[in-house]
């Protein structure tokens, strides 16, 4: 039976040179086919999408692999079989930043998400940065409107909740949001991922990769895990 590929939950820096070592690691031993979805940025318009596609193209060129853009901007395109077919043969599927609720709601239960999940379970690496990392959990809060109910996520890592950009975000994290985020069911771990940093592996054993740290958050405080640390997250 084929083992699922690794998951990378990235705090920031997708497609930038600072995280080339991470993306190279995720592609190592896999098909050199770098599948990219800028869906989370679709509400910002075509200019934003074009920027993400250009960054992704530059990253693929530095890594010497093929860039494949999956042009999902709404649920219609997410359910298009021809669009979903672009995921086939991926070595790495990457969900970049933007709006976490929009990304999760757009992909949830669609042909494209099924294709991504199949590729991942078949051994492809699966990465989400910022909004993408949040959407890979099963609990997607609207960080700009913390009192709104969270949306269901894509549930690739249902035992985690993720706060990206944590080093920048933590200093202005509203108490009401932090209280809600750490109020989790048994077996769910809340992690803050600093910028230019990733939590890589899964589902239970992870490594901190990148420039800074990952933090485990509880009602009693936070514990730092610097780059190179191994972190265990129980699944229930």
Regions found by a protein language model. Give the residues of each.
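C-terminal and late-domain segments of enzyme folds
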Residues: 1-30, 40-54, 58-61, 140-142, ...
């Amino acid at each position: 039976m084929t083992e699922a590929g690794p998951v990378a939950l990235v705090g920031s820096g997708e497609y930038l040179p600072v995280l080339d070592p991470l993306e190279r690691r995720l592609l190592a031993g896999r098909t050199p086919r770098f599948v990219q979805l800028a869906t989370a940025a679709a509400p910002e318009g075509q200019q934003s999408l074009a920027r993400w596609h250009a960054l992704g193209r530059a990253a693929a060129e530095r890594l010497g692999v093929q860039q494949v853009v999956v042009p999902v901007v709404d649920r219609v395109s997410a359910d298009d079989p021809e669009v979903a077919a672009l995921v086939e043969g991926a070595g790495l599927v990457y969900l970049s930043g933007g709006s976490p609720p929009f990304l999760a709601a757009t992909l949830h239960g669609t042909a494209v998400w099924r294709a991504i999940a199949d590729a991942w379970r078949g051994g492809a690496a699966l990465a989400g940065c910022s909004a993408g990392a949040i959407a890979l959990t099963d609990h997607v809060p609207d960080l700009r409107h913390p009192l709104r109910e969270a949306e269901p996520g894509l549930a690739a890592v249902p035992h985690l909740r993720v706060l990206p950009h944590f080093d920048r975000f933590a200093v202005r994290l509203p108490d009401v949001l932090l209280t809600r985020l750490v109020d989790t069911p048994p077996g769910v771990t809340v992690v803050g991922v600093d910028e230019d940093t990733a939590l890589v592996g899964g589902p239970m054993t992870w490594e901190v990769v990148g420039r800074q740290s990952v933090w485990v958050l509880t009602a009693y405080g936070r514990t730092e895990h610097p780059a190179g640390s191994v972190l265990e997250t129980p699944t229930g």
